[in-house]
């Protein structure tokens, strides 16, 4: 994941210019294949992962589909660069989870995981209009940040007890959608146990 300023561009680059401040992830995408057009650029049929962003300069293939131009250019304050860096991975991943969980008005969304991706999923679910956001968290500082980002309820319980708590808060049904933001079998089990029949797990 990286941010940077374009210092040179190839002839095939059509949407970016020298001097543009851009955000990139560790994935390349052409932005034109059927998978990209469906909204899944990290699974591009014609690209994949790459490395090299720790270097001072790097060449980014498929730049039009892989880089996002930041309006307004590079911030004057160097300390703000880290804010943009979050958009290269954790914010997009959390946003994707909330979209895949079908977050929106009238929905209750649960978030499994209180790390950076989970916290961004809370922020995304609220931004997408979810009525209620529940997060599983046992860490006081992260729970406080989750509330600041829009979480309405924090659940410390895990496993069957955690799923029972979600169901108790949703008239016995379970959440309309669950954002799984850990990546373990246990966290996926928690997500599946907490979602209602016909619900979504992102």
Segments from the language model and where they lie:
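Glycine-rich beta-strand-centered segment in the early N-terminal region that forms part
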Residues: 1-37, 71-77
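Buried hydrophobic positions in well-ordered alpha/beta secondary-structure cores of metabolic enzymes
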Residues: 4-6, 19, 33, 58, ...
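Helix-to-beta-strand junctions that scaffold the AdoMet/dcAdoMet cofactor pocket
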Residues: 195-197
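N-terminal Rossmann-fold NAD(P) dinucleotide-binding loop
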Residues: 118-119
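Adenosine-nucleotide cofactor-binding segment
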Residues: 111-114, 126-190
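Glycine-centered, small-residue-biased loops immediately flanking beta-strands
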Residues: 107, 199-200
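NAD(P)H dinucleotide-binding glycine-rich loop of Rossmann-like/cofactor-binding domains
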Residues: 30-112
């Amino acid at each position: 994941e990286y941010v940077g300023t374009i210092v040179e561009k190839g002839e095939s680059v059509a949407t970016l210019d020298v001097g543009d401040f851009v955000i990139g992830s560790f994935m390349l995408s052409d932005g034109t294949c059927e998978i990209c057009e469906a909204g899944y650029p990290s699974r591009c049929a014609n690209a994949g992962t790459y490395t090299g962003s720790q270097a001072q300069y790097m060449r980014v293939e498929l730049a039009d589909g892989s880089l996002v131009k930041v309006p307004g250019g590079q911030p004057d304050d160097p300390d703000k660069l880290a804010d943009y860096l979050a958009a290269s991975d954790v914010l997009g991943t959390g946003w994707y989870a909330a979209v895949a969980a079908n977050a929106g008005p009238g929905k209750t969304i649960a978030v499994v995981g209180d790390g950076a991706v989970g916290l961004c999923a809370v922020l995304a679910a609220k931004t997408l209009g979810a009525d209620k956001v529940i997060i599983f968290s046992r860490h006081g500082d992260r729970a406080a940040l989750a509330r600041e980002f829009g979480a309405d309820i924090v659940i410390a319980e895990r496993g069957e007890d955690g799923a029972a708590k979600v169901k108790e808060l949703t008239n016995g049904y379970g959440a309309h959608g669950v954002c799984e933001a850990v990546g373990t079998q246990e966290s996926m089990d928690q997500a599946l146990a907490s979602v209602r029949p016909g619900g979504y797990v992102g």
